[in-house]
Every structure is written in structure tokens, then in C-alpha cells.
Amino acid sequence: MIENQSDNIDNKENDLSDQDNALENVSSAQELTTENNELSSQKTEEINTEELKNSISNNDARLEQLEKEHETLKNQYVRISADFDNFRKRQSRDQDDLKIQLVSKTLTAILPIVDNFERARQQLKPESEEAQSLHRSYQGLYKQLVEVLKQQGVSPMRVVGQQFDPSLHEAVLREPSEKFEEDFIIEELQRGYHLEGKVLRHALVKVSMGPGKQNSQEEVEKDKVEGDIDSEENTSEDV
């Protein structure tokens, strides 16, 4: 009986020992699992950090590439915009030049008519009332023609007393002069005209060969006054 009890006690002790071993094994397993989890978590963090670094590096490279592409496209846009602006300006100039050429061609054909009116005004001296009335009618037409030319941007050249300029004047005659120095214009033989600042028709002029003095200031003022009076009377100086 006592032996049986002793065996039971031994068995219980063995069971307790087994339980303790089992608990120790469980605890060791838990610790190992925890360590594994920590290692796994650390490794995962390292992997994530590396991936993040790679992603940032890739994004930086992509950003740099996009910035270069943006700069390239920007430069292309600036060049295209400048080319288009130059093209637009060139087209505008070409259109203006074409317009001036067409207007010049028409006005150049009209100028001989103006010359005829001016010659008639200078040469004809109507005496009878009927002739004077007819002359006034012609002069009325002449004034209308002059006004049309002014509206188109036509202006006359003032040449007498000016130094000869081949870009503006055409020398038909040259003669000595005591009044004007060499290469100064003595007389206007056919009026020259400008159109919008450009030469519409060169003035035909008589040029001094010298010797002589250039017009004194008093003579210049006198010629200017006489020209203004002639302009007021005949309006031909207003073209």
C-alpha cells in the first residue's frame, strides 16, 4: 500500500517535471518566435527602407529628366514664338510695302496731270471774264486733286537752297551762281514728292556750279516768305 502511494507520488513528480519541461519548451518557443518576429520586422524595415531609397532615387532621376524635357520644350516654344512674331512682322511689312507700291504706281500716273495744272496756272493769264471763270473752274479741280494727294500721304519736296542729294534730286542742269555755293540747288524744274516718308518722284533741279556764296539768311527768309505767299494764292505748295 505504501509502495503504491510512493509510486503515485513519483508519477506525480514526473508529471510535474514533464509539465515544467513543457512550459519551458513553450516559453523557449515563444521567445524564439518573438526573436524571429523581431528579426523579420527588422529585415522588413531594412527592405522597406532600401526600397524607399531606390524609389526616391528613381523619382529624383525622373524629376531631373522631366526638368530637362521641360527646359527643352520651353526653349522650343520661345524659338517658335520668336519665329512666328518675326514672320508676322515680316508679313505686315510686306503688305505695307505692297500697298505703298500699288499706291505709288497710281499716284505716279496722276502726277503729270498735277504738273499740267501747275504749268497752266503759271503760263495762262486769262483776261476776259469768261476766260477767268473757266480758269477758276480748272483751278477748283486742281485744288480737289491736290487735296486727294494730301489725303493719300503725298507731300512736296522743298528743294531750292538745299544741298543736292541724289537720293532725292535729279540734276538736269548745272550753271555758275553767285548766290549759291557749288552743289546747292538753284531752281526746281519739276517738283518732287514724298509718299509716307519715301520718295515718290525725284525732283528735277538746276544745280549751282559755284563760285558764290550760299544764300544768306535774309535771302532764305525772303524766298520762304515769297513761297508762302505763292502757296496761299495757288495752294499748289500744299500738296
From Swiss-Prot:
Highest taxon listed in the record's lineage:
Bacteria
Cytoplasm in keyword set:
yes
Q: Where is this region: Disordered?
A: 1-54, 208-239
Protein keywords:
Chaperone, Cytoplasm, Stress response
Write out the GO cellular component annotations: cytoplasm
Q: Which GO terms describe its biological process?
A: protein folding
Tell me yes or no: is Cytoplasm among this UniProt entry's keywords: yes
The Basic and acidic residues compositionally biased stretches are 43-53
Q: Where is the signal peptide?
A: none
Q: By its UniProt entry, which PROSITE patterns does this protein fall under?
A: GRPE
- State a single Gene Ontology molecular function: unfolded protein binding
Locations of Polar residues compositional bias? 19-42
Here the segments flagged for biased composition (Acidic residues) are 228-239
Q: Which family does it belong to?
A: Belongs to the GrpE family.
Record function comment = Participates actively in the response to hyperosmotic and heat shock by preventing the aggregation of stress-denatured proteins, in association with DnaK and GrpE. It is the nucleotide exchange factor for DnaK and may function as a thermosensor. Unfolded proteins bind initially to DnaJ; upon interaction with the DnaJ-bound protein, DnaK hydrolyzes its bound ATP, resulting in the formation of a stable complex. GrpE releases ADP from DnaK; ATP binding to DnaK triggers the release of the substrate protein, thus completing the reaction cycle.
Q: What is this protein called?
A: Protein GrpE
The gene that this protein is the product of is: grpE
